[in-house]
From Swiss-Prot:
Cellular component aspect of the GO annotation: aspartate carbamoyltransferase complex
Entry protein name: Aspartate carbamoyltransferase regulatory chain
Subunit annotation: Contains catalytic and regulatory chains.
Function (record text): Involved in allosteric regulation of aspartate carbamoyltransferase.
Signal peptide annotation: none
SUPFAM superfamilies in alphabetical order: Aspartate carbamoyltransferase, Regulatory-chain, C-terminal domain, Aspartate carbamoyltransferase, Regulatory-chain, N-terminal domain
Pfam families, per the entry: PyrI, PyrI_C
Cofactor binding note from Swiss-Prot or TrEMBL: Binds 1 zinc ion per subunit.
Entry binding sites for Zn(2+): 105, 110, 134, 137
Keywords carried by this UniProt record: Metal-binding, Pyrimidine biosynthesis, Zinc
Cofactor or coenzyme needed: Zn(2+)
Cystine pairings recorded for this chain: none
Family designation: Belongs to the PyrI family.
Species this protein is from: Picrophilus torridus (strain ATCC 700027 / DSM 9790 / JCM 10055 / NBRC 100828 / KAW 2/3)
């Protein structure tokens, strides 16, 4: 007999689905603390991915900057907006061509790390795996280096 544990539905909020297995806590960490109740499914069976992670965040609706951050860690993620227990909108995160102000350059000598009023700007060189290149110093970053430098 197969036993299944399901994450309960949320009344209003955001569901982040199709996160690569083991990445849910990283996604949650970059979203920061909020007042929403959070349900986490880690290494859940998925027909599409084999194993995946899922986040359900009650009473929280994400901004574009949050979606850009998620795209850096989980570019295959699907976002569902839930109102009154119904999905009213569903879409995949979209990796922008350029990333502004949400990642710090790992090059300590970059102008963006000096005491200058310069906002960071990165070009997305690759979507899989995600690779960013600083517009100012051409330093490339990928994987954990991006996660470590998220602002």
């Amino acid at each position: 007999m197969e036993k299944t544990l399901k994450i309960s539905k949320i009344r209003d909020g955001t569901v982040i689905d199709h996160i690569s297995a083991g990445k849910a806590l990283e996604v949650l960490n970059i979203l920061g603390s909020n007042n929403g109740s959070i349900s986490i499914g880690i290494r859940v069976n998925s027909k599409k991915m084999g194993l995946k992670d899922v986040l359900k965040i009650e009473n929280v609706f994400l901004e574009k900057e949050d979606l850009d951050r998620i795209a850096l860690i989980a570019p295959e993620a699907t976002i569902s907006i839930v109102k009154n227990y119904e999905i009213i909108e569903k879409f995949n995160v979209d990796m922008p061509e350029k990333i502004y102000g949400i990642v710090k350059c790992s090059n300590q000598n970059c102008i963006t790390n000096a005491n200058e009023p310069v906002k960071t700007e990165f070009i997305v060189d690759s979507r899989s795996p995600v690779t960013l290149r600083c517009l100012y110093c051409n330093r490339s970053m990928s994987g954990d280096e991006i996660i470590k430098n998220l602002i």
